[in-house]
Regions:
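Flexible coil/loop and intrinsically disordered linker positions at secondary-structure junctions
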Residues: 7-162
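Short, small-residue-biased leader/transition segments that mark boundaries at the very start
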Residues: 2-4
Length: 162
């Protein structure tokens, strides 16, 4: 193939460096970065969940909660399984709402999906709250064991975890 430069001298295309040569490798790099970010986000969420819910939930229940978090992350919020705290300490509705908000914020999911996720995960604890109420009150800042944790811009890490 031939192409013409401003000087009108024909130059073979192979002599011009191909700007698109790295296109595929750049796409692959971006995909790998995204996969790593998603993995790192899920690790941070799991560590946060263990720290914030261990006094309320059994190991088995936390494992179910992990699966439910994967469901919400994969846009399968209706696949969430119910959890019922069997420990003495009961997790409060505000704590559950804040937990849903904090996790959902890291995953970038809608308030509606956060409400469905937490209601599906804790139907007994949230038996007096409907989806609309939960959706509207996820971020209402009331004193409880699990405070709202707003992530820093562009970051998924949680604050105040040991």
């Amino acid at each position: 193939q031939m192409c013409i430069r401003d000087s009108q001298d024909p130059v073979e295309e192979e002599q011009i460096p191909d700007s698109l040569e790295r296109y595929e490798s750049i796409l692959v790099e971006e995909q790998l970065k995204e996969v790593k970010r998603k993995r790192d986000t899920m690790i941070a969420i799991r560590e946060y969940v263990v720290e914030k819910t261990s006094k309320y939930l059994s190991k088995e229940n936390i494992s179910t909660l992990f699966r439910n978090i994967e469901c919400i992350a994969e846009n399968r919020v209706n696949d969430c399984q119910p959890i019922h705290s069997t420990k003495e300490a009961k997790i409060s509705s505000p704590s559950l709402r804040h937990l849903a908000w904090n996790i959902g914020e890291r995953l970038g999911v809608s308030r509606r999906d956060r409400a469905i996720f937490i209601k599906s995960s804790f139907p007994y604890e949230l038996r007096n709250a409907d989806i609309e109420y939960l959706e509207a009150n996820l971020r209402v800042n009331v004193p409880c064991d699990i405070p709202i944790d707003v992530p820093d811009k562009g970051d998924f890490h949680f604050h105040n975890i040991t």
